Amino acid sequence: MTTLPPGLDPASVRAVAMDLDRTILADNLEFSPATVRAVGRLDDAGIAAIVATGRMFASARPYALQLGVTAPVICYQGALVADPHTGEWLLHRPMDVPLAHEVIEAVDAAGFHMNVYVDDRLFVEELNEEAVTYATHARLEAHAVGDLAAWLDRPTTKIVVVGQPEALDRLQDELRAHFDGRAFIAKSLPIFLELALPGVSKGSALEFVCERLGIDPDDVVAFGDGANDVELLEAAGLGVAVADADAALAPIAGWTVPSVDDDGVAGFLDALVDSRP
């Protein structure tokens, strides 16, 4: 039986916000039966289930529907919020073309592969190993367009750099120094470095969704594993990290649960529902 945090009133929780990859979605890109059951119990308990992911909407939507989620889905690190059933975009905060061009040129000069997202489609320079790896992870098609800077003439929702973890750590430091707050920069997974409009985050998107649902963010429990989940956990009344989470979450999380492989979030959700009056 999972133990809930001391001081948490289960009856006060009105929503849970959940990252996907490595939080409730395993490395095999599947939900465990326990996770599907636990999330499915939330609606009957009067708790809204909110998916908050760095994934594209086209990639996240099937997962949200599999879980039976009806609340708006937070995608692209918070740059896009959309209705999982109608597909309507409720919020979109893309990077303008000049900023996107500057990012593309900086990443290209560093010699890394990158993905560019326009109109919820994935575009790459060429279909190389990195492009195929990402497209497989997202379960979507990548479109090769050649020179990305020359091709891009519209705002882009975000840009993702693909590479080895240590190399991306160094690039992240370089890009943060170069852009100096002019872009959101964070890792979603060890091999994915994400860049978006400054001010974009899962936390700001959670506040937007809560306002639409008439929920106080203080009445939300948020779950995450990555450095890109810091703002999500900060925005919620209670932030919960999985056991193998990025070290950046340690000072933010008010509670920890076992890893996705051990159904940590599912256990917490079951305990939460079972403890409500």
Say what each PLM segment does:
Residues M18:
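Active-site T/S-Asp motif of two-component receiver
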Residues P33-A131:
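Active-site phosphate-binding/coordination module
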Residues T3-A15, S32, E194-P277:
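Mg2+-dependent phosphoryl-transfer enzymes with acidic/Ser/Thr/Gly-rich catalytic loops
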Residues D27-F31:
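Conserved ATPase-coupling elements of RecA-like P-loop NTPase cores
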Residues T35, A60-A64, L171, L175, ...:
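Hydrophobic packing residues within well-ordered alpha-helices of enzyme cores
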Residues L67-V69, Y76-Q77, F179-G181, A235-A236, ...:
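Short, structured coil segments at secondary-structure junctions
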Residues A106, A110-F223, A227-E231, A235:
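Conserved acidic, metal-coordinating active-site core of Asp-based
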